[in-house]
């Protein structure tokens, strides 16, 4: 299964490699339409569309550069609520004894280029429940691949959701 997932990802990435940012109609591709009910939060290192009904992100998007990958701020932090976000959000207690990992949507390892970005990576608005085997296995492998590509190609754009 791991090989199939990796090959599928590689095919998708290679198919898009070298294509312009124009869509089929010839118009430039744009950000998805954001409505008044969307909760888009712009952090220093990533942007998240947070779903106040499911209490997990709809998506997270960010640019990762080769310089950022080499950041020196150590992983540290404790998951907590984003007190500046006034909408309903998950709490640490939601994950207590649940059997689920608190899985970063934008990984802390991609945000080690500043103390602030590292801190923001631990907001509960940046996590979703993940099976431990997935979180520490294939998902981790995919996160590392994104960092490898950022080093190889100078920057990558990552969207998760």
Regions found by a protein language model. Name each.
Residues 1-21:
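Bacterial Sec-dependent N-terminal signal peptides
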């Amino acid at each position: 299964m791991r090989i199939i997932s990796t090959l599928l990802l590689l095919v998708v990435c290679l198919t898009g490699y070298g294509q312009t940012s124009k869509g089929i109609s010839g118009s430039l591709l744009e950000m998805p339409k954001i409505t008044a009910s969307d909760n888009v939060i712009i952090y220093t290192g990533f942007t998240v569309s947070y779903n106040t009904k499911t209490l997990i992100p709809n998506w997270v998007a960010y640019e990762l550069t080769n310089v950022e990958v080499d950041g020196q701020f150590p992983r540290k932090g404790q998951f907590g609520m984003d007190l500046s976000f006034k909408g309903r959000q998950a709490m640490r207690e939601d994950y207590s004894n649940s059997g689920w990992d608190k899985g970063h949507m934008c990984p802390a390892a991609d945000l080690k280029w500043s103390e602030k970005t590292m801190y923001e990576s631990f907001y509960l608005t940046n996590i979703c429940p993940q099976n431990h085997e997935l979180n520490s296995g294939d998902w981790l492998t995919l996160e590392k691949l994104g960092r490898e590509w950022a080093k190889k190609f100078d920057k990558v754009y990552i969207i998760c959701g």
